[in-house]
């Protein structure tokens, strides 16, 4: 199937929570994380804010239907990936990689020095996926105050402390 990556538009925002919910279904394969499939997702206002800033990209199928997205936010001289989700029926098609490539292009053009994210350390489609694309796992000290605050918040909402990690791709 043919896919296209483009900058997200305001009218896309209402469709994005359903994509994130679909992507979350993959966590049902991992009994200890199955609860994530039923957890809340980012709201429309979150997406609209990042779309307005120009740091939100969409993967769409040949019919122009949204099937994935990457939402990012500029934090000083880094671009932080807040969410990368691909609808379950469209996973394993290289869309996550293509969305990340678009974010890297944007980061270079915006004079960012790195991309950052937090993710699950041992879930195959999380940290191992990002590591294959050049992201490095950070120690607690290397993560810095901003990423440590995100990891702390993730613990507060129910993630086990040792299950999450911060990663960085230096440009």
UniProtKB/Swiss-Prot annotation:
| SUPFAM superfamilies per the UniProt record, alphabetical | Acyl-CoA N-acyltransferases (Nat) (SSF55729)
GO MF assignments: acyltransferase activity, transferring groups other than amino-acyl groups
Q: Does the keyword Transport apply?
A: no
Domain called N-acetyltransferase: residue spans: 3-162
InterPro entries assigned to the protein according to its UniProt record, in alphabetical order: Acyl_CoA_acyltransferase, GNAT_dom
Alphabetical keyword list: Acyltransferase, Transferase
Say if the entry is tagged with keyword Transferase: yes
The residues the record assigns to binding CoA are: 84-86, 128-130
Q: One Pfam match, by short name? A: Acetyltransf_1
- Enzyme Commission number(s): 2.3.1.-
What this chain does, per the record?
Answer: Catalyzes the transfer of an acetyl group from acetyl coenzyme A (AcCoA) to an acceptor substrate and releases both CoA and the acetylated product. It can use a variety of substrates including spermidine, spermine and N(8)-acetylspermidine, 7-aminocephalosporanic acid, colistin and thiamine.
Protein name from the UniProt record: Acetyltransferase PA2271
Give the originating organism: Pseudomonas aeruginosa (strain ATCC 15692 / DSM 22644 / CIP 104116 / JCM 14847 / LMG 12228 / 1C / PRS 101 / PAO1)
The lineage is: Bacteria, Pseudomonadati, Pseudomonadota, Gammaproteobacteria, Pseudomonadales
């Amino acid at each position: 199937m043919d896919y296209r990556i483009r900058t997200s538009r305001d009218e896309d925002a209402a469709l994005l929570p359903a994509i994130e919910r679909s992507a979350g279904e993959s966590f049902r394969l991992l009994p200890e994380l199955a609860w994530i499939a039923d957890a809340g997702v980012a709201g429309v206002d979150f997406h609209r804010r990042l779309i307005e800033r120009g740091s939100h990209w969409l993967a769409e199928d040949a019919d122009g239907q949204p099937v994935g997205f990457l939402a990012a936010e500029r934090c000083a001289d880094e671009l932080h990936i807040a969410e990368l989700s691909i609808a379950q029926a469209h996973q394993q098609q290289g869309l996550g990689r293509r969305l990340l490539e678009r974010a890297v292009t944007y980061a270079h053009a915006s004079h960012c020095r790195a991309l950052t994210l937090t993710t699950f350390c041992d879930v195959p489609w999380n940290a191992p996926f990002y590591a294959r694309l050049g992201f490095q796992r950070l120690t607690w000290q290397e993560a810095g105050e901003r990423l440590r605050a995100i990891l702390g918040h993730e613990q507060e909402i129910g993630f086990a402390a040792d299950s999450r990690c911060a990663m960085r791709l230096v440009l």
